[in-house]
Every structure is written in C-alpha cells, then in structure tokens.
Amino acid sequence: MARTAHIVRETSESHIDLELNLDGTGKTDIDTSVPFYNHMMTALGKHSLIDLTIHAHGDTDIDVHHTVEDTAIVFGEALKQALGDKKGIRRFADATVPLDEALAKAVVDISGRPYCVCSGEPEGYEFCMIGGHFTGSLVRHVMESIAFHAGICLHMQVLAGRDPHHIAEAEFKALARALRFAMEIDPRVDGVPSTKGAL
C-alpha cells in the first residue's frame, strides 16, 4: 500500500497544497512564499527521503506566521495520513546533526500521542530574524505544529550553536533524519510496534 498523502487546506489567511510520499528519494518542489522556510522544508524533504511538494501562499504582507504555521499543520496531517495504521514501522528514532558550530538532536516516537519538547535554544534566539522574514520563535512553533498534527512525540534539543540560521537548519535536518528512520519499515516487525496492538 502506497504511503502517500495529498492535502489542500484553504482559510482566509492561507492556501496550502501539499503532497508527499514517505517512501520517496527526497525529491522536493517547495514554494511557501517564505524563502527561508522553503530552504528548511527542502532540507526536511531531502534528508528524510520524503518526496515533498508544497505550494503555499497567504497573507505574508501582514506576517509570515500564518503561512508558516498552516504549512506545518498540513505537513503533520499528511504525515499522519500517509503513515496509515503504522504497521511495520520502526516507530522510535533519534538523530544528532551538526551544521558548523550548531548541533541539534531530535528524538521521535510515532506514538499517536502528540507531544513536543524543545530545549536548549540560546537566549534571544526566538527574537532573531533569519533570512529577512523568519523569526527564531517560528522554529519551535513549526516543530510543535508538526508533532501535534502528525500525532508524534518529538523532543528537539539544541546542544550548541551561535548562528541562528545554522541552529534552525540543524534542527530541521535532525527532525528529517529522525523521521526517516522512525517511519522506515522494519521487515522483522509483524504488525503494529506496540504492546497495545495499536498506535
């Protein structure tokens, strides 16, 4: 069964058209109308091996927040839909990713219980403007939105870093690598990887 999803979400604030394939090769076509976010979501697709197409636009003349958040919501919903009954997945994974002086660790449990803990960001990171439009605070918001709508438990920890761009990129890449391995089908797993029999 193909692990794919295609979701269109339209509100008065944004229009999101997102398609993904969990068993892809990391091919991406990303246009969120927010250049730095394009860069981050492209990295997320590339390093998770998710084929990812996103066409999004919104009221970025007011602020990029709505478009960024709504894209993360739809990405999380698409992950959940594509994972289906979660039979055969590895479920747990972690990844630690450097980018020059920055180091981020992501730990993922595809549990069906949404939870997100972000820690370790340097003081003032949330106020930094990255790429002209994207604030550091949006990184945490994206992680929370993905985790909540995908139904996953995510711990994201910044272990080191000074440059806000490097920190954010290390976080997105760490999430990508952790998702890649957590979503992967393990041929030794028969059914759902839970003692309850459901996730």
Curated annotation (Swiss-Prot):
GO CC aspect terms: cytoplasm
Top enzyme category: lyase
GO molecular function: imidazoleglycerol-phosphate dehydratase activity
Pfam annotation, one family: IGPD
InterPro entries cross-referenced by the UniProt entry: IGPD_sf, ImidazoleglycerolP_deHydtase, ImidazoleglycerP_deHydtase_CS, Ribosomal_Su5_D2-typ_SF
Catalyzed reactions per annotation: D-erythro-1-(imidazol-4-yl)glycerol 3-phosphate = 3-(imidazol-4-yl)-2-oxopropyl phosphate + H2O
Protein family membership: Belongs to the imidazoleglycerol-phosphate dehydratase family.
NCBIfam families for this protein: PRK00951.1-6, PRK00951.2-1, PRK00951.2-4
Protein's name according to its UniProt entry: Imidazoleglycerol-phosphate dehydratase
Organism: Bifidobacterium longum subsp. infantis (strain ATCC 15697 / DSM 20088 / JCM 1222 / NCTC 11817 / S12)
Gene: hisB
